[in-house]
Structure formats: structure tokens, C-alpha cells
Amino acid sequence: MFWWGDYSVSTEHMVYLNLKNGIPAPRSDSAEMNGLTIAEKIDGQIFIDTWGLIFPGDPANAAEDATITASVSHDKNGLYGAAFISACIAQTFVTNDIDELIDIGLSFIPSDSTYAAVVRAVSKFHAQNPDIWRSCLEYLQQNWGYDRYGGNCHIIPNAGVCVMLLLYGRNYPRAVEFSTMSGWDTDCNAGNVGTIMGVAC
């Protein structure tokens, strides 16, 4: 299932039209060709839950295949989100320790990426403010919000929300509930986090 929203709006539709017009992969989906706004939309991580589920306990293969899949239409942080989420899902079959899951996810993405930076920032905020999830949401809105990134659904703010939901939710119902209350891409974040927490339960 892909979002068909027209050229320069929907990542998948734009890449499809690039391919149809004779621009071969991987140039058809590259940030150099399409710009970071398109290459780093949230779609890179929201369609890859399956890889974590078919590689239970094997985050390396889950991250690799999720990255390959996401690379059809995304680049850079769009790929890192695919690797991070799928690795977390796969590792959840081994442990339900949220901090360990986050560390595993981080081990499959570049440590100097913006994606890794938002994950670490939310983890640090939670360590210092472990009780009130809304304070973390306010922190994300002020420091990692949509106003800082191009397009209508960038992966970075939503990655922050996903990590916040894992850390503050701590169980399936709360994590999904907090997701729908947090705004931004509520259904996608609930889907990713719901998969992780669903396996963990």
C-alpha cells in the first residue's frame, strides 16, 4: 500500500513516475534527485514492519531487508528509520527491555545521523524526566517539530514520537493511546510502536 499523492508530494508516486520516465534506480529515489524533503518522508519506516516479524530475533537481517525495501523510494534518514524500526521489532522477540531495543535499533544506523540524534535526545530527556510523557512531547514540538523539516510528514519528528511512546508507554494500550494523542502522524506512529509493543506483550 503506497500513498499516491502526485509528483513532489508523495514519495512513492514521485519515484514511480521517475521510473516510468526512464530514470533508473537508485537515482530515481535518491536525495540528490528528489531532495531531502521527499527522500526523508516517514514512509521509509511505516511500510516495513513485516521484516521485523519475519526475522524474529534477527535484527541484522530485518534491518538489511527493510533498508533494501525502503531504498526503492527513500534515502538517508528515510532508510535509517526503516532499519531502526525493523530491528526493534525483530529484537522484541528476544527481549522486551525498551532501552535494549533502542540500543539495538541504533546499532544499525549511522551514529552521526539526524535520526540517531533524535533517538538519543528523547532517550536522554526520558532519563531526566521519566514520569510525564506530555513534557517530552512539548520538548519534541519545540526542538524537533515539523517547523524544522520540509514537507508534510518528515520522518524525524515522528521518529522522536515513536521513541517517546516506547519509553513512556511501556505497554501496548498506553503506547497506542499516547500515539493517537500526540498528533503528527498518529496512525503511522501507532502502527510502528503498536507492532513493537504488541510483540513485547
Question: What do these predicted regions represent?
Answer:
Residues 1-201:
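Structured, active/binding-site neighborhoods that engage oxygen-rich ligands
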